[in-house]
């Protein structure tokens, strides 16, 4: 009797097990699991690995009840300023948070899920999607069967950052993301603290202004500011800021070395601009020294020595700038003397 009971029990367990294998998770179960994962993820971006790609994409028959937009990331490339992966990742999370906020109470909120795949432990997924370069974003629609044929963002779609990503999502999914909700630069608490500081310091500032005891009344501050503005203008700082140029890059032939100067006229590293700006500033300061200090020296010999020293340093600085320009552009600068001098 005991043997028969054990056999019946084992048979029952086997039937349940086979039934489970024959009936994988339904679409609603997968969608609910994605919603659960999204609720615990930062900005609603779900971290995927190789198993998740198989579970939620390749193992699910089409049409799926949801779309997935995936950002491909590589932590070891975050230091590459030209790729700007951390910035694009933040913008992608911003689009995700905006979409969830604006579609939280609607059925559309469960039709699209934002995900990210990191290359360290998911190289197989990169190969499945045929990811050859970063940044890369793929949209897996409900009818996508071949992952290599998923909708991908073009290079131009990244120019507008979060706004361009939102346009791509709306164009491909017909869902509404709405305007991007960027976090304020200053929180309400910080604004309150700043206002309190201004209110407290206003009487003190007014008193100092009336007495002429502020930094704006100190001629040395204006002198330093003028030198800074001059250096800022001649060193190409705005070029570096606008184009986000790095100070230096690693040598392609030897990764242990750094490159500060590039022999290319269309590209300039930050170190190049600062070097040229420093030389220009030296010449400008020497000119100010000669016209404001040397002329007041009473001894003629000291005047001449100071003038010769200033001219020598200025000549050296200008020569370095000309040499760098010749090296980058490949064009030589030749002096042309008046015909009467050639005698």
UniProtKB/Swiss-Prot annotation:
The keyword Calcium does not apply. Residues 23-185, 242-273, 326-343 are lumenal. Residues 207-220, 295-304 are cytoplasmic. One of its GO terms (cellular component) is endoplasmic reticulum membrane. The chain crosses the membrane at residues 186-206, 221-241, 274-294, 305-325. It is a multi-pass membrane protein. It is found in: Endoplasmic reticulum membrane. Keywords: Endoplasmic reticulum, Glycoprotein, Membrane, Signal, Transmembrane, Transmembrane helix. Its main location: endoplasmic reticulum. Glycans are attached at residues 105, 108, 146. It comes from the Eukaryota. Residues 1-22 form the signal peptide. Subunit of the oligosaccharyl transferase (OST) complex that catalyzes the initial transfer of a defined glycan (Glc(3)Man(9)GlcNAc(2) in eukaryotes) from the lipid carrier dolichol-pyrophosphate to an asparagine residue within an Asn-X-Ser/Thr consensus motif in nascent polypeptide chains, the first step in protein N-glycosylation. N-glycosylation occurs cotranslationally and the complex associates with the Sec61 complex at the channel-forming translocon complex that mediates protein translocation across the endoplasmic reticulum (ER). All subunits are required for a maximal enzyme activity. Component of the oligosaccharyltransferase (OST) complex. Belongs to the OST3/OST6 family. This is Probable dolichyl-diphosphooligosaccharide--protein glycosyltransferase subunit 3A. It comes from Arabidopsis thaliana.
């Amino acid at each position: 009797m005991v043997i028969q009971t054990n056999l019946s029990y084992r048979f029952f367990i086997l039937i349940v097990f086979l039934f489970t294998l024959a009936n994988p998770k339904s679409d609603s179960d997968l969608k609910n699991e994605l919603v659960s994962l999204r609720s615990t993820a930062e900005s609603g971006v779900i971290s995927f690995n190789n198993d998740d790609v198989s579970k939620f994409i390749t193992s699910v028959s089409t049409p799926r009840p949801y779309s997935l937009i995936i950002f491909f990331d590589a932590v070891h490339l975050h230091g590459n300023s030209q790729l700007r992966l951390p910035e694009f990742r933040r913008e992608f999370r911003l689009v995700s948070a905006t979409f969830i906020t604006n579609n939280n109470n609607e059925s559309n909120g469960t039709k699209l899920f934002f995900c990210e795949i990191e290359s360290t432990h998911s190289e197989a997924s990169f190969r499945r999607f045929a990811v050859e370069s970063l940044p890369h974003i793929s949209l897996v629609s409900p009818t996508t069967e071949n992952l290599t044929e998923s909708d991908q963002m073009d290079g131009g779609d990244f120019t507008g950052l979060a706004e361009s990503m939102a346009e791509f999502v709306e164009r491909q999914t017909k869902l509404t993301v709405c305007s991007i909700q960027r976090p304020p630069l200053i929180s309400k608490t910080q604004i309150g603290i700043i206002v309190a500081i201004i209110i407290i310091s206003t009487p003190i500032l007014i008193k100092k202004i009336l007495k002429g005891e502020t930094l704006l009344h100190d001629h040395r501050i204006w002198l330093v500011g003028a030198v800074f503005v001059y250096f800022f203008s001649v060193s190409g700082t705005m070029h570096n800021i606008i184009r986000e140029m790095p100070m230096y890059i690693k040598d392609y032939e030897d990764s242990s070395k750094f490159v500060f100067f590039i022999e290319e006229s269309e590209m300039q590293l930050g170190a190049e601009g600062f070097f040229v700006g420093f030389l220009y500033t030296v010449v400008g300061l020497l000119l100010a020294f000669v016209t404001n200090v040397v002329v007041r020296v009473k001894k003629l010999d000291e005047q001449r020595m100071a003038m010769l020293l200033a001219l020598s340093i200025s000549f050296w600085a200008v020569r370095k700038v000309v040499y760098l320009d010749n090296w980058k552009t490949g064009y030589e600068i030749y002096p042309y003397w008046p015909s009467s001098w050639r005698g």
